[in-house]
Regions:
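Short amphipathic alpha-helical surface micro-motifs
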Residues: 11-17, 30-33, 108-112, 218-222, ...
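Intrinsically disordered, low-complexity segments enriched in polar/charged residues with Gly/Pro
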Residues: 20-23, 149, 224-226
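Metal-dependent phosphoesterase core characteristic of DEDDh/y 3'-5' exonuclease domains
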Residues: 25-32, 36-67, 90-218, 283-287
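Short loop/turn and capping residues at structural boundaries
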Residues: 75, 124, 161-162, 250, ...
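Short Asp/Glu-rich motifs
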Residues: 83, 170, 258
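Acidic two-metal-ion nuclease catalytic site recognized across multiple nuclease folds
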Residues: 178-359
Length: 359
């Protein structure tokens, strides 16, 4: 039987700044909290463990301030992370569907497991439900808000504080239960999220998903942005309704080297707008998340206008560069002439200083 595991983590970090962090291990988990929901989105159980830190053994002041935890409590009541994580996975069961508020918790869970050389039991790709995303999609016109704001907005407050793992998991579970009733499972369950901790290792593993209203593609890792944008799989635009490969009306362009846009038109389904987000990997290589979405005439015009704005800004930058080069060149050619003029003035002054007495 399928269970929804709604979990939350609290973590600590270097108390002496990022430069003192352990490479590839910026956050150390100090608390695991979770609630279990059945297929009807009813809560059936809770899980909670404190974790005894082994790496960052001094509490970062901001973490202590938010969570109200201290190192004495963690040392006396916490378990070693491998033990706590193993117990958590056993409690989850084999048919678990993970749910979190935001996209950080699964990533940090796996990063901590890797640090302690634990086997990663999750499937690849790892699909989960981002309840923050679902709430924004169905309750806030795609706007993302904080957990406490969503709970307050839905009048779900209880005598439980925020910023502790079990309490945050509980409130996230309450919101998921609410969404499971309205708009209901048929509406929310198609919108799975993809965890990016373990990326596709080759072209065969690249991820292509279709949702109500858009499609998503997650690429393998590329050495550079240029390599990514030279790949046909990255830049192609296919209508997710009929599978037709489309010719672009507006080729991929970027206003900031991080996000790219394009526009195509399907003969049967109309305009299709594309968005590519370049995401860095720790070694400065990149992977691509591409979304394609059908749009109307107004949406198409917004892409066309954005492209024109980028063209104007680029033209203005080029004009300023040419102007600066001309100014530098003019200054360089003017300097020798000024030098000769000064010499001439000195010679004329020297001659004019000769008097008749000298003669």
């Amino acid at each position: 039987m399928k269970n929804y595991i709604v979990f939350d983590l609290e973590w600590n970090q270097s108390a002496n700044g990022k430069e003192r962090s352990v490479p590839h291990f910026p956050f150390e988990i100090i608390e695991i909290g979770a609630v279990k929901l059945n297929e009807n989105f009813q809560m059936t159980g809770e899980f909670h463990r404190l974790v005894r830190p082994q790496v960052y053994t001094q509490m970062h002041h901001a973490i202590s301030e938010v969570t109200h935890m201290n190192m004495k409590e963690l040392r006396s009541s916490g378990e070693l992370f491998p033990d706590a994580a193993a117990e958590f996975l056993v409690w989850c069961g084999g048919d678990a569907v993970f749910c979190t508020w935001g996209n950080m918790d699964l990533l940090e869970l796996q990063r901590n497991m890797d640090y302690y050389h634990m086997e990663n039991p999750f499937p690849k790709p790892l699909l989960y439900y981002d309840v923050q995303k679902l709430y924004g999609l169905f309750c806030r016109e795609n706007a993302r808000i904080s957990l406490d704001s969503a709970v307050e907005e839905q009048n779900l407050m209880e005598d439980r504080p925020f910023h502790r793992a079990l309490d945050d998991a509980y409130y996230t579970g309450k919101l998921l239960t609410m969404l499971g009733k309205t708009p209901g499972p048929d509406a929310i369950l198609p919108f799975k999220s993809v965890d990016y901790y373990r990326l596709p290792s080759d072209k065969k593993e690249e991820i292509r998903m279709t949702f109500p209203g858009y499609s998503k593609y997650v690429s393998r890792v590329f050495d550079s942005k240029e390599d990514a944008m030279a790949d046909k799989g990255v830049t192609e635009m296919m209508c997710y309704r009929c599978g037709r490969m489309l010719r672009k009306k507006i080729r991929w362009f970027t206003p900031n080297q991080k996000t790219y846009f394009a526009l195509a038109c399907c003969p049967d389904h109309g305009y299709l707008k594309g968005k590519i987000r370049m995401k860095k990997v720790e070694d400065e290589s990149v992977f691509v998340v591409k979304t394609l979405k059908l749009t109307d005439e107004e949406g198409a015009q917004s892409i066309i206008q954005r492209k024109e704005d980028v063209r104007k800004k680029r033209a203005e930058r080029n004009r300023m560069k040419r102007k600066q080069k001309q100014a530098v060149k003019k200054a360089a050619t003017a300097s020798p002439a000024d030098g000769r003029s000064a010499s001439s003035r000195r010679r004329r002054k020297s001659k004019s200083s000769i008097t008749t007495k000298d003669v």
